[in-house]
Each structure stands twice: as C-alpha cells, then as structure tokens.
Amino acid sequence: MNGTEGPYFYVPMVNTSGIVRSPYEYPQYYLVNPAAYAALGAYMFLLILVGFPINFLTLYVTIEHKKLRTPLNYILLNLAVADLFMVFGGFTTTMYTSMHGYFVLGRLGCNIEGFFATLGGEIALWSLVVLAIERWVVVCKPISNFRFGENHAIMGLAFTWLMAMACAAPPLVGWSRYIPEGMQCSCGIDYYTRAEGFNNESFVIYMFVCHFLIPLMVVFFCYGRLLCAVKEAAAAQQESETTQRAEREVTRMVVIMVIAFLICWCPYAGVAWWIFTHQGSDFGPVFMTIPAFFAKSSSIYNPMIYICLNKQFRHCMITTLCCGKNPFEEEEGASTASKTEASSVSSSSVSPA
C-alpha cells in the first residue's frame, strides 16, 4: 500500500519515515508545502466571496419580484439553496481547516462538512436533472397538453431532496464513511480503503451508478432531444431570421450547460473511480484535491448559467441592484421583442425560466 490508513483517515503517503500523523490532530505540512494550504484557503475565500452574494441575491430577487415566483423558478431557488449549503457547510469549513493545515474540527466536524458538501452537490445535481426533464417535456411535448404547474414543481423539489439524502446520509449511519481527502482539509466519501464493517465497495458502486451515471444520461438525453426539437422547428421556418437566431442561442446555452456539468463532476468522479479501482496505488494529495474543488466551484457556475442567461431574471436582478430602475431596460426590451414571432423555440421557452 502506498498510503497510511488509520482510524477514520487515509493519508496518501507511506509512513516509512514515521512522520505521518492523524489529519485530525496534526498539521499535514509534510504532504505539500504550507503555501499550498494558504492558496487553498484563499481559493475557498474567493468561492465564498462570489458564491454567497450571487446565490443570496437569487433568493432575494425572487422573493421581491412576484412575476418570478413561477413553478419552474422553484427549482432555480432550490439550486441557490443547494449552493448556499455548499458555501456555509463546506467552503467555510475548508477555509478554516486550510488555515490550520489539518482537519482541526475533528471527526464530528468531518462528518458535518462531508454531509453538507455532499448534500448541496447532490441537490444541485438532481435539480439540473429536474430542469432537463421539464424542458424536454414542455418543449418536445412527449405528453400532449402537459403544463408544468406548482404541484409538479413541489414534487420535483421533494425528489431532489430525497435523492440527495439517499446519497449524503448513508455514510453517517455506517454505509461507507466520510474521511479527510486530498490535502486532508476537506472531507468526502471513502473511496480509498476497504475498511472492515463499512461496505465501502457497495456504496461507491451505488453512488456512481445512481448518483452520477444515471443523472448524466438523463441530462444528455433530455437536452439532446431538446436540440433536435429546436433544429426541426428552425428547419420548418428557414426564412425566419429570428427563429435561426433563437436556435443558435438555445444551442449555445445547452452546450454551456452540458460542458459546465462535465467540468464540475467528471474530473472528480473520474479520479474517485480510479482511486477506488486502484486502491493501494501511488498518488499524491493534490491528485484528489484539484478535482474535488472543481466540483465545489459549481456553486458559482449554477447561478451564472441558469439565472444570468435568463433575460427576465437578469432584468429583475439589475432592477434590484439599481434601486428599482434598469438602465439597460430599453435595449433588453427591444431584444426580447425581436424574438416574439419565434416564441415556440425562443430561448425564453427553452431556457430554465
């Protein structure tokens, strides 16, 4: 084994020199340069500095503007709540532990940080799935005369929380466990060991299949069908410039959505799966740290993609920030009006709002 396993931790360094210590009790500066811990703390501070205002503003703007309180925007609010979970439950903790160079909050703190970071990430992930399904059903109309209402939105919210809890809660009750990972300043699922009594193998397989592969396939299917529907509608109205413009905008937005999804989750999932299938192999602490924080940065990607690209929401947000007046209102109004005749495939119809 090219690491040191202890009670509730796994340090990716062989303890031949006798310097490896518990990440709950001692600084881990023997793993990487102390400057790396300072850089990690600064990065987490940046995520807090950006992630909290934009997600809080999302909640505030929706509450302030009645026209935004639509059933579909409930899912967008769910994304903001999930991101705030990650900010307060994960980012603040990691910033604090990075300043000390080890997981100073102990085993209980590791469970709390791991749970809230996982819960927030999974709520966000399944919210994206619900958005994808809603867009597919509404735009592609596999079910005739379907209208996404408040009851559907509430069921969607309940579904995201149920699936998120089904992933985040089991490690708290003995099916797998949360342990410090990477530079030992944040906690995640134990992909590293086959510790007796925790059934890590079955949980990791369950998590990858049910909480990564299936959501990924659903998102690709729904947005793939969505693009096909947009192309078919545009082909039927080739003389319409506004339709062609709408097609391009929708295509761009969907591509950004899928790329962001992959950037956030594929590096972390890929590295975690490699570690799981190559337990005992040699790897450094940074190997898991970098992809883990790509996944955490989804708290910034989500509001930028799903809200800032939404014209109505952006208008309301600017109005709120500018004390009730939008200096770009005339320009945005003209842009919106130019798409009226292509309403069946316009970006406002296909974007998540």
Swiss-Prot record:
GO function terms (MF aspect): 11-cis retinal binding; G protein-coupled photoreceptor activity
UniProt PTM comment: Phosphorylated on some or all of the serine and threonine residues present in the C-terminal region.
Positions of the UniProt region annotated as Disordered: 331-353
Residues modified by glycosylation: N2, N15, N200
Main location (coarse class): membrane
InterPro entries referenced in this protein's UniProt entry, alphabetically: GPCR_opsins, GPCR_Rhodpsn, GPCR_Rhodpsn_7TM, Opsin, Retinal_BS, Rhodopsin, Rhodopsin_N
Positions carrying N6-(retinylidene)lysine: K296
Annotated localization: Membrane; Cell projection, Cilium, Photoreceptor outer segment
Lipidation positions, renumbered (S-palmitoyl cysteine): C322, C323
Disulfide bonds: C110-C187
Listed Low complexity bias regions: 334-353
Record-annotated membrane-spanning stretches: 37-61, 74-96, 111-133, 153-173, 203-224, 253-274, 287-308
Sequence similarity: Belongs to the G-protein coupled receptor 1 family. Opsin subfamily.
Name of this protein: Rhodopsin
Origin species: Lithognathus mormyrus (Striped seabream)
Gene name per UniProt: rho
